Amino acid sequence: MTRKDLLGSYGEREALAVYNALQLSGNFICFAQSFMHDEDYQVARNALWTLTKATDEELSSLQPILNELIDLAITTDNSSVRRLSMNVIERLKITEDNLRTDFLDFCFDHAIDPAEYPGIQSLAIKLAYKMCSFYPELKAELILTLENMQIEYYKPAVKSIRNRILKGKYRIKV
C-alpha cells in the first residue's frame, strides 16, 4: 500500500479496494501509522476511512496504538480526520487502566458543543459514556450533563444517542 493509493478523490469503491488489499497484508498497525498523520488531510482521512471498513477483530490489532489515535483525535484540525479516528477509537477496548482523562475531557467538551459536527458529538457522547462506565460518580456527571443539554439546538443523531443513554438503552460494545 502506498500513499499514492490514498491520494485524491476517494469513494466507497476505493475505500473497499484499499481495505481488501490491507486485509490481505494484515498489517493494520503499519498502515495506520504510515498514513493517519499524513500532512495531506485527504490521505489521512482516506486511510482512516479504510480502517472503518475493518472488522472489530481486525481493528483490535490497533489496540497498541490507541494512544496515538486518541492524540490524533484531540489534536487534528480536520473534522473528518477527527470523526474517523474517533470512530476507530470507539471500536477499540478502553479499560480503567488505559483511560485518559484528557480524552474524557475532550469528549465532554465536544459532546455538548452545538457548533461541533453531529457525527463528532455523537461519538464524543458514546466515548464519554464508555469511559465513565468505570466510575459511578463520572457516569452520574455525564448523565447530569446530558439531561441539562438544551436539546433543541442539537441534530437528530445527537438527540438519539443522548436519549438512548438517558433511557438506559445504550449498550457499550465489549
Model-derived features with residue positions:
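Alpha-helical scaffold domains
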Residues: 1-174
